[in-house]
């Protein structure tokens, strides 16, 4: 959903 989709 986030524009910077990391696996955090």
UniProtKB/Swiss-Prot annotation:
Task: Give its localization.
Answer: Secreted
> Where Leucine amide occurs, residue numbers?
8
Q: Which domain of life is it from?
A: Eukaryota
Q: Name one GO biological process term.
A: neuropeptide signaling pathway
**Which Gene Ontology terms of cellular component type are present?**
extracellular region
Asked if Hydrolase is a keyword of the record, the answer is no
Keyword list (alphabetical) reads:
Amidation, Neuropeptide, Secreted
UniProt keyword Ion transport present: no
Family statement drawn from the similarity comment of this UniProt entry: Belongs to the allatostatin family.
The protein, known as: Cydiastatin-3
